[in-house]
């Protein structure tokens, strides 16, 4: 890891992560013009924030900007049943086949080259997670990473119904490429929610 990457990892991860996340969440909801303007100025300084696609151009708080809606007609979902659209904006970090069979502990995916993790650990490592790991062995996965400036709402990727949500408590590690190549099983350590979707033909998606 070069000096620049080491510094990036230090500044984004070797801090009181959970406390900082809670503070930023509190700060972002303050509805004072000077707080909003200062926060957005700093945000634009360190990112490529583009609000040209946003439905609204003025926001009461930083949080309102972060969860902004898009103008109507943007991000259309492909209606073909054999196509699954991306549920969000994002950069593809990894994709491929879910490897392993036979035992839930053997079913693996990759967060980065050379950094595998067990699917059961991602799903919560309970009885439901073990059953799902076996069900999805041999299936496909894709990892999407949202940068801070991207549109941050999520949408159902195809015609389906939400059957269950599993919440898994955890840390708040940054998921940038530097961290993914430095922290093993990072996704399994972070706070997360597993959404169980089922298509009309019975196919299950996570």
Language model region names:
Residues 8-9, 16-25:
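Long amphipathic alpha-helical segments
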Residues 1-3:
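Conserved small/polar residues in nucleotide/adenosyl-binding loops
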Residues 102-137, 141-151, 157, 165-206:
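Cytosolic, membrane-proximal regulatory domains of ion/volume homeostasis and mechanosensation machinery
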Residues 33-125, 134:
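Extended, compositionally biased flexible segments
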Residues 26-32:
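Flexible, non-catalytic peripheral segments of proteins
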Residues 93, 163-166:
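Conserved positions in beta-strands of structured domains
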Residues 160:
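Phosphate/adenylate-binding glycine loop and adjacent helical scaffold
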Residues 6-11, 38, 42:
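Short helical patches
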């Amino acid at each position: 890891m070069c000096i620049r990457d080491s510094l990036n990892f230090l500044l984004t991860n070797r801090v009181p992560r959970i406390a900082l996340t809670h503070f930023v969440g509190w700060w972002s909801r303050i509805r004072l013009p000077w707080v909003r303007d200062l926060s957005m100025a700093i945000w634009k300084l360190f990112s490529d924030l583009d609000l040209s696609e946003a439905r609204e151009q003025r926001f009461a708080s930083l949080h309102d900007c972060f969860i902004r809606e898009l103008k109507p007609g943007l991000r259309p979902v492909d209606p073909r049943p054999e196509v699954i659209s991306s549920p969000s904006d994002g950069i593809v970090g990894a994709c491929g086949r879910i490897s392993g069979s036979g035992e839930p502990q053997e079913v693996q995916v990759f967060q980065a080259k050379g950094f595998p993790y067990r699917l059961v650990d991602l799903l919560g490592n309970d009885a439901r997670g073990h059953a799902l790991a076996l069900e999805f062995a041999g299936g496909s996965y894709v990892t999407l990473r949202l940068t801070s400036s991207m549109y941050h709402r999520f949408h159902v990727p195809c015609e389906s119904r939400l059957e269950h949500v599993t919440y898994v408590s955890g840390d708040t590690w940054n998921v940038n490429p530097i961290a993914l190549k430095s922290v093993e099983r990072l996704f399994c350590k972070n706070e997360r929610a597993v959404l169980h979707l089922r298509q009309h033909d019975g196919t299950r998606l996570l």
